[in-house]
Amino acid sequence: MKKLKNLFLILLLWFYPLRSEPINEGAYILEEIGDVLRFLPIFVGTVSLAMRDYRGLGELAVGTLVTQGVIYGLKGAFSNAHKDGVRVGFAKRPCCNSWRGMPSGHAGGVFSAAGFVYYRYGWKPALPVIALAILTDASRVVAGQHTILQVTIGSLIAWGFAYLFTSRYKPKQWMLYPEISSDFKGSSRYGVSFSYQW
């Protein structure tokens, strides 16, 4: 578990972006929250892994990767279209002279996780994840990185791919797993445990 935690922290620091300076301290804090929450698929995937829902973890990975691929493909297409003289004002970031604002990658990431939880585990567990996803979208707008249209389109793309790639979770009635323990004398014990739910 400690190795997994260290690996997560290393990945978080490695992928941490260079950020623009927002208008005020409140917007800066909100932007930081949004930057951390874009890793929501990793957090949700960790929960699926802890539940031993390997199929769900795979579906989350596929949905998130396809979403990000489509979003970054669209960003590149709109940027190239602008260079070729096509009017794509909706793709311009509000903060700067960048034409890679449509759709929002942060919104796509967090709504991949939210859509996955909704379609895999149901609406009740999805409520807090959806709230965090909406907070991330708001952080991108307040920070001046995206318009409302850009985060909405990114969110809808992610939700659509979550719908396509996610199946309903059906817990297994039985489990077979290895058991390793030691007794009070320090001797190791190895075995196999079987459990069945009625």
Name these PLM-found stretches.
Residues 112-116, 160, 193-195:
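Outer-membrane beta-barrel architecture
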